A protein has these predicted regions:
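N-terminal small-residue-enriched
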Residues: 1-480
Length: 480
């Protein structure tokens, strides 16, 4: 679908039903504009979303929602004036524009002409996941996943699965004349199992997703999700209490990158650096990590959960190098913070919906691979912990301090992975941990497409990833 077709799709969904041709949008900008206004935009959004769940062998259509609305924003210096409406109409737009202008407390006017089309390479197909399977097929998919889990081992007592899909159409009209549209599909499938043995119960989970439709959940993927979830639960049934203390920790590839995302990635977002609240503020060009550590944010990877063709300000996403060979090289920016910091836009302006303000946010954030074979990394450890999967955690974004619980971990003894352990928590400081990376694997892996990031009350889909990493001297909280 080319740019004109995307715009036509968005116009048909968001503008034409409400008689909002370009002339009327021009009038809204005219009512909104002020002499010292630095920027302004209108953000139209239409979303259909559904959720299906399976528990105790029963599939339920848990949710179905249709939401639409428009957000009106004006920027003056560091100030943002914002109003939104869940009604799309010329009258509602005029009201929102007046409210926004009143917040800005400025007078005057400036015409805007919505003529230019914004263009960016497409990162996914404009699919409608909800229409890609009928209801019976969605039920059958969840039931098959349950059967696969139970068939793997008789100790599996409970299976819970969730299937979700979203079809989103957005249109961004900007005061500089650009008009950009995007059609964003999103799907997610997750499963959790509980296994029981000798009165002990343990859980395991798996799943995946991306910007595509339900066709991605092939039989092979369902079998892999079942294997991962059940195997994790069975490993935890045999796990010993984790030791506590300061030790070498090896992080597995893929989803353990969530620690990098939370404890380090947020500190590389423009707003925290502009306000001086990030541990990385004022350190551009300085060494902030061990040699060999390169961290990027890339919103252009095809079909990934965190990818976007354009961000929520209509700017094309890109690959941004944040840390290069241990040196701080870049930050993630939206238009407000890029302008105030006099730094380039990176296409990271994101919002949960039309009713939320844009913030600089991550897309797919990961550490690049190094030169070491993962087996070599394990062999180098005399005594330590191998954490291959994470559960929940807490992070202080300002300081980078974190506590993360390992959902699956093992002891490393004399260069070998030995027994599984349970109850391990990793405790540390993100920027400090970056300096303690001593070996980087050649096995970069991205997460399976399940991540959601929260910031200032807003949730957006993201991707994470990393290769196998050896971290010297990290505090481990245990139960032994």
């Amino acid at each position: 679908m080319d740019v004109d077709t995307l715009l036509a799709t968005a116009d048909a969904c968001l503008l034409a039903p409400y008689d909002l041709e370009a002339r009327r949008l021009d009038a809204v900008f005219g009512a909104l504009a002020a002499p010292r206004m630095d920027d302004a935009d209108l953000y139209f959004q239409y979303t259909r979303a559904e959720g299906w769940s399976l528990e105790e062998g029963i599939v339920k259509a848990g949710s179905f929602a249709i939401e639409q609305g428009v957000g009106v924003r004006a920027l003056q210096g560091e100030r943002t004036a914002f109003a939104y409406s869940d009604e799309i109409s010329f009258a509602a737009l005029e009201d929102a524009a007046r409210a926004t202008r009143a917040i800005a407390r400025q007078g005057g006017g400036r015409p805007a002409h919505l003529a230019r089309r914004g263009a960016a390479p497409r990162r996914y197909q404009p699919l409608d996941p909800l229409a890609s399977l009928d209801s019976g097929a969605k039920v059958a998919l969840l039931e098959k996943l349950e059967r696969l889990c139970r068939a793997r081992d008789p100790r599996v007592g409970q299976v819970m699965a969730q299937l979700g899909g979203e079809y989103e159409v957005v249109l961004v009209a900007r005061a500089d004349g650009r008009r950009v549209a995007d059609v964003r599909p999103l799907v997610r499938l997750s499963v959790q199992v509980i296994a029981e043995q000798h009165g002990r119960r343990e859980s395991g989970s798996a799943g995946g997703g991306g910007r595509t439709d339900y066709a991605m959940f092939t039989d092979e993927r369902l079998e892999e999700y079942a294997r991962q979830a059940v195997d994790q639960a069975l490993v935890n049934l045999e796990a010993r209490p984790a030791p506590a203390g300061t030790m070498t920790v090896v992080l597995g590839p893929g989803w353990p990158g969530i620690l990098l995302h939370e404890a380090i990635g947020h500190g590389l977002e423009g707003d925290f650096n502009r306000k001086g609240s990030s541990a990385f503020a004022g350190r551009m060009g300085e060494r902030v990590a061990a040699p060999g550590v390169t961290v990027v944010d890339d919103g252009t990877i095809p079909d990934r959960r965190g990818s976007l063709t354009v961000d929520d300000e209509g700017n094309p996403t890109r690959r941004t190098v944040l840390i290069e060979n241990g040196v701080l090289r870049g930050l993630l920016q939206d238009s407000l913070n890029a302008r105030l910091m006099k730094m380039p836009l990176t296409g990271n302006g994101r919002r949960e919906s039309y009713a939320h303000l844009t913030l600089p946010r991550m897309t797919n954030t990961f550490m690049l691979g190094g030169s070491h074979d993962p087996a070599e990394i394990i062999r180098s450890v005399k005594k330590g912990l191998y954490a291959v999967n994470f559960g929940g955690g807490q992070v202080d974004i300002t300081s980078g301090k974190f506590v993360f619980s390992a959902a699956e971990s093992y002891l490393i003894e004399d260069g070998r992975v030995t027994v599984p352990v349970k109850g391990a928590t990793l405790i540390g400081n993100g920027p400090d941990v970056l300096t303690r990376v001593s070996m980087i694997g050649n096995d970069l892996k991205l997460d399976p497409g399940i991540g959601t990031c929260g910031k200032e009350g807003q949730s957006v889909p993201v991707g994470v990833g990393q290769p196998t990493l050896k971290i010297d001297s990290l505090t481990v909280g245990g139960t032994a």
